[in-house]
Every structure is written in structure tokens, then in C-alpha cells.
Regions:
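N-terminal export signals
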Residues: 4, 10-32
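Short, cationic motifs built from Arg/Lys/His that form the positively charged side of catalytic pockets
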Residues: 8-9, 164
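Short, glycine-/small- and polar/acidic-enriched structural segments
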Residues: 22-25, 29-191, 202-203, 207-213, ...
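Short Gly/Pro-enriched turn/cap motifs at secondary-structure boundaries
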Residues: 53, 124, 232-234, 302-303, ...
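Pocket-lining segment of extracytoplasmic ligand-binding domains
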Residues: 106-108, 183, 195-293
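Predominant activation on well-ordered alpha-helical scaffold segments within soluble catalytic domains
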Residues: 110, 164, 168, 217, ...
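Secondary-structure end/capping motifs
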Residues: 253-347
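Conserved C-terminal helix/tail region of periplasmic/extracytoplasmic solute-binding proteins
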Residues: 331-393
């Protein structure tokens, strides 16, 4: 087993501002520019596949596949994974063709395809669950966030969708571009890069944040906050991040795309059975957080976090790796996004047919084949390709 990490020169920490995705300056990613990118891919079919990721445990499958040599085993040339600091910088690089495969917030994937008309496809779920609402030590209930600001990683994120469901369930109103009011029972939403959230909580700038791990585990380890609710306890086994590939990769390098998916699915199967070992790999040059914090995030138990769970049988505390992309989730997510407040272009949601979105945006061909190669759906604790969504704020 290899323990290679990306070289220092490949770590791109771009963009220090908010994680809001506005779509400005993204013309290079529109479908009419696809021919230029296609020509580039066709001219250099052996160019290494370039991977982009954020320093969060959500990226585990992409990174485990690299560390364990699974891409090599699948005969797929890959460059060292490139670390980005914010979702906006990662998304912009992907749309502009600077990286070929990434993990991405699923609502952002919808915006990328329908808002920006980018030539991209969801090819698998990258993971399920893995996020939480973390608050200051003095915050006991969601209602206590009245008059506070809460950080979100991006407007188009499952985090924002689920947070707003929690706020409304507690009788609070999310607001943007205005100061929150305790008497008015409002909460200000503040887009922020995940790496900035813990310092902001510690300095009293925000009352809480909703984000992927290991930033929730880090807050508890440093005793500056506590996990109030795991998002997987609100929306059971939801897809936070999906695996996305550029259309150029799928069209002009189908063997590389298929091999890449084989490696990714193999990594998911390995990671869900080897959590401490996964933490060790991630801490060896891929993520900046220390191994104990990463391992804590990968090994949460319902017994230790009972106060953050209302449905312990859902195991919403558990970051899991289940690659099959369920149509029911896509459809419910589209409907939820249409009810979510954002300070970003939202016209692309008007008139979207949830079922059609899944057929147009998600291509499960490769992942279905790859799942069979590692033992089928049962290898991931799954029993079928349909399910019913369960949401309880």
C-alpha cells in the first residue's frame, strides 16, 4: 500500500473570500466553449487526469484511490491531487478546464449545469452524510441562534438547504445582507470558506456553522464549540458531495473515465471498512488537520453523540461511502432548493422537472459497472437502486 501525498507545489490554496457562488466570470465553462476543451482533450488523450479537492473528509475516496495506487491499478494516469481552499475556487477551476474530476456539493452541481450551462456530469455519489451544525458552547437549542450569524460553505449546498429547514422548524427566519435580530427571531446566513469557520466561531464572529468534517470534530477537540445536530440525522443518508467529471473526459477518454470510476469505487469500499487507516492516509500530506481530528471525524459513534441525534437508528453521525446516485434524492433536492433562500442567481430553478434533472445531469453507467466489480450494492450496505427519502428537521 502506498502512502504518497501530493507534492507541496501541487497544493493550490486559492481564494480567501466567501464561498458564495455567484457565477460571475464563468463564461469559459458554458456549453458553447465545449468544442475548445474537446479539441484539447482529443489532442492529448494521454494527459493525466487532474483531480481537485477541498481539505475535508468528503474528499476521502479521491485521495484514498491516489494514496493506495488504485488509479495506477486501473491504468489511469493521474496528476497529484490539487488542494483548493474554497468551493468557489474549486468550481471555477473545474468549469474552466483546469481540473478534470472533483468532488462537489450537489446543489452546486445543479447550478453549474443549469445556471452556467457547463459541460459536466455527476458520475457517482462521493459520500453520504459527513456534516453537522456546530455551535458555540452556550448554544443549547437551535432557537438560541436568534440574533446570531451562522456560516455556510456556499449558497448552493446541502448545508444551506438543511440549515434552513432546521431554522424554520425552530421558528427562526434566515436573512441575508442584514443584521440578525434576536427579537425578530432572525438568523443571518454568512457564506464562508470552511477553513475560516473555526477561527470565526472561536472569535465570536458567528454563533455557529454548518460544514463538512473534520471542522466539526476540530471544534470539539479544541473545546470552542459542540456538534448540535448531524445533518445525516435530518436528511437520512443524503449525498453531500458528488463525483463530477468534465464532458471532455467522458467523451474523449472513456477508458480513463471508466478506470477512474473503478478506482474511486474501490477506494470507497476500502475506506468504509478501514476508517483509522483512512485517517492516517489523509493526514500524510492530503489534509492539513492532525490525524486524531481526522480519525475522530471518521469514527463518530451514536453513543458518544446521542445529544446530536434524534434518530439514532439512522446513524446520521457516520460519514459513509455509498457511490450509487439515487434518483429520488436528486428529485427531492431540486424541490428543496426551490424553497431555499439564497443570495445568488436562482432563476435556473424555475420550471425544472426534478425527474428530468436526474436523467440529464447524472450518468450512473460507469458507477453501476464499477460497483459490480467490488461485490455489488451489498458491499456498501445497499439493497437496491430505489429508495424513499426520509427528512426530519
Amino acid at each position: 500500500m502506498s502512502t504518497r501525498g501530493p507534492s507541496r507545489r501541487t497544493l493550490l490554496r486559492a481564494g480567501a473570500g466567501a464561498a458564495a457562488l455567484t457565477g460571475l466570470g464563468w463564461g469559459a465553462g458554458s456549453l458553447y466553449a465545449g468544442s475548445q476543451q474537446d479539441a484539447r482533450g482529443a489532442a492529448d488523450p494521454e494527459r493525466p487526469v487532474r483531480i481537485g479537492y477541498l481539505p475535508i473528509t468528503d474528499a476521502s475516496p479521491l485521495l484514498v484511490a491516489h494514496a493506495n495506487g488504485y488509479y495506477e491499478d486501473a491504468a489511469v494516469p493521474v496528476a497529484d491531487p490539487v488542494l483548493f481552499r474554497s468551493w468557489s475556487s474549486l468550481s471555477e477551476a473545474f468549469v474552466a478546464g483546469k481540473v478534470d474530476a472533483i468532488h462537489l456539493l450537489m446543489p452546486m452541481a445543479l447550478y453549474m449545469r443549469y445556471g452556467l450551462r457547463a459541460d459536466v456530469r455527476i458520475t457517482a455519489w462521493n459520500h453520504t452524510n459527513g456534516s453537522a451544525l456546530t455551535v458555540r458552547p452556550d448554544v443549547a437549542e437551535v432557537a438560541d441562534l436568534a440574533g446570531e450569524s451562522v456560516a455556510i460553505p456556499a449558497w448552493w449546498s446541502v448545508h444551506n438547504v438543511v440549515l434552513q429547514q432546521l431554522l424554520r422548524g425552530a421558528g427562526l427566519t434566515p436573512v441575508m445582507r442584514e443584521s440578525p435580530s434576536r427579537t425578530g427571531r432572525t438568523v443571518a446566513l454568512l457564506p464562508m470558506a470552511p477553513s475560516d469557520m473555526l477561527p470565526a466561531l472561536n472569535n465570536g464572529v458567528i454563533g455557529g456553522y454548518v460544514v463538512a468534517d473534520p471542522f466539526n470534530a476540530a471544534a470539539e477537540a479544541r473545546q470552542v464549540g459542540h456538534i448540535h445536530r448531524f445533518l445525516g440525522d435530518v436528511w437520512r443518508d443524503h449525498a453531500c458531495c458528488v463525483t463530477m467529471m468534465r464532458g471532455e473526459l467522458l467523451r474523449h477518454r472513456p477508458a480513463h473515465a471508466a478506470g477512474f470510476m473503478d478506482a474511486l469505487v474501490r477506494a470507497q469500499a476500502w475506506a468504509r471498512q478501514n476508517r483509522p487507516e483512512t485517517a492516517a492516509l489523509l493526514a500524510a500530506g492530503y489534509l492539513p488537520q492532525p490525524r486524531p481530528v481526522i480519525e475522530r471525524a471518521l469514527t463518530y459513534s451514536a453513543a458518544a453523540h446521542g445529544e446530536a441525534l434524534q434518530h439514532p437508528d439512522w446513524h446520521g453521525e457516520r460519514l459513509d461511502f455509498r457511490p450509487y446516485p439515487y434518483a429520488s434524492f436528486t428529485e427531492e433536492l431540486v424541490r428543496a432548493m426551490q424553497e431555499t433562500v439564497v443570495d445568488a442567481p436562482a432563476g435556473f430553478l424555475d420550471g425544472l422537472d426534478p425527474a428530468l434533472v436526474h436523467r440529464e445531469l447524472v450518468d450512473d453507467t460507469l458507477v453501476t459497472r464499477s460497483i459490480e466489480k467490488v461485490g455489488g450494492l451489498a458491499a456498501f450496505g445497499l439493497t437496491g437502486t430505489t429508495r424513499t427519502e426520509e427528512i426530519s428537521a
